[in-house]
Amino acid sequence: MAKKIAILTSGGDSPGMNNAIRTIVKTSKIHGIEVFLVYNGYKGLVEKTIKNANEINVDQYIGSGGTFIGSARYLEFKKLEVRQKAVQNLKEMGIDSLVVIGGDGSYAGAQLLHELGVKTIGLPGTIDNDIASTEYTIGLDTALNTIVENVDRLRDTMNSMNMVALVEVMGHGAGDLAMLSGLATGAEIIVTNAHRKSIDEMIEIVKDQMIAKTKRSVIGIVSEFIYDDLKKVAKEIEDKTGIRTRAIILAHTQRGGNPKAYERINASFLGIAAVESLLKNESGVALGFKGNKIISTPIPEALKAQNSAKNENELVTKINKINQS
C-alpha cells in the first residue's frame, strides 16, 4: 500500500487537471497517505521542486483552468542517468508512488519510472482526446466548449458579412476536436487527418453552399497540421470564388479557461480511482473511461492502442452531409 504519493502534470496543460490533483490530495488524506506536489512536470522530479500538499489549499483551484503545479516538456528525461536522479530524489523523500497526469509522452515517462521500481499511475490529461485506451481525456469537454463559443461568434459576423471562415483547431493528429465541434456548430466543412479535403473540394463546397444554396456563410473546421499555411488556403478559396475568406487560428485559447462541470466531475472520478489503484498496489497502469466505467490498462498497451481512422472518416462524412444539406 502507498505511504507517500507524489503528483505531477506533464506535457500540454488541459482544463480539469486541477480537479484531478484536488481529489487525489483529498482522497489520499482520507486514507492517511501523505501527498507531495511536483512542480513543472518531470523536470521538477529531477530538480527536486517538490512540496508537501499540506502547504497548499487545493480547494481554491477547483474552478481554475491549467495546472497550478505547472507543466513542462522535458526531453532530457529520456536519459537513464536523468531518470535515476529523479528516482533518487523520490527515495530521499520517502515517496513510493507517483500519479502522472498528461498525454502519451507523459505515459512513456511513467512507464520508464515504473521499470525503475516507482509505483506509477497514469491519468489522461490532454484536450486532444488522442489516447486510444480511454474514450475521454481530461480537457476535451472544456476545449470543445471553447471552440464552439468561438465558432458561434464567428458565425454571427460571417453571416453579417457573407464570408467564409476556416478555423484551425488542435488535435495532435486526432480528429475529435474538429469532428465534434463541427457537429456542434453545423460547420459545413470538417477536415481531419482521417478525412482530408483538397482545396478544390473546399472551393466546390463554398460555391454550392453560398452561391447555389444562397447561404450567408460557410464555416470550415480544420485539424492542425493538415495544411502548411491555412492563410494561403483561405486566400486561394477567396481568389477562386470571389467570396471573402479568413483563416482563424484558435491555438492555445483551446487549452485555457475554467473547466466545465462535466470536466470537473470526470477528472475528480479519475483522481479518486488513481488513489484506489495505488491502495490495491497497482502500478504501471493508465486509467481511463469506457462507457461510464473507469478502466485500467497497462501503460505499454495504452501507448500501442490506436483509434480507428476508418470510423472517424465515416463519422465525419456523415456529419459533413448533414451540415451541408
Curated annotation (Swiss-Prot):
Binding residue positions for ATP: G12, R73, Y74, G103, D104, G105, S106
Pathway: Carbohydrate degradation; glycolysis; D-glyceraldehyde 3-phosphate and glycerone phosphate from D-glucose: step 3/4
UniProt: ADP binding residues: R22, T23, I24, V25, K26, R155, G186, A187, E188, K213, K215, R216, S217
Highest taxon of source: Bacteria
EC number: 2.7.1.11
Cofactor(s) recorded in Swiss-Prot or TrEMBL: Mg(2+)
UniProt keyword list: Allosteric enzyme, ATP-binding, Cytoplasm, Glycolysis, Kinase, Magnesium, Metal-binding, Nucleotide-binding, Transferase
Keyword Flavoprotein (UniProt): no
Active site: D128 (proton acceptor)
Primary location group: cytoplasm
Functional note: Catalyzes the phosphorylation of D-fructose 6-phosphate to fructose 1,6-bisphosphate by ATP, the first committing step of glycolysis.
PANTHER family per record: ATP-DEPENDENT 6-PHOSPHOFRUCTOKINASE, PHOSPHOFRUCTOKINASE
Protein name as it appears in the record: ATP-dependent 6-phosphofructokinase
Source organism (scientific name): Mycoplasma mobile (strain ATCC 43663 / 163K / NCTC 11711) (Mesomycoplasma mobile)
Lineage: Bacteria, Bacillati, Mycoplasmatota, Mycoplasmoidales, Metamycoplasmataceae
Name of the gene encoding the protein in the UniProt record: pfkA
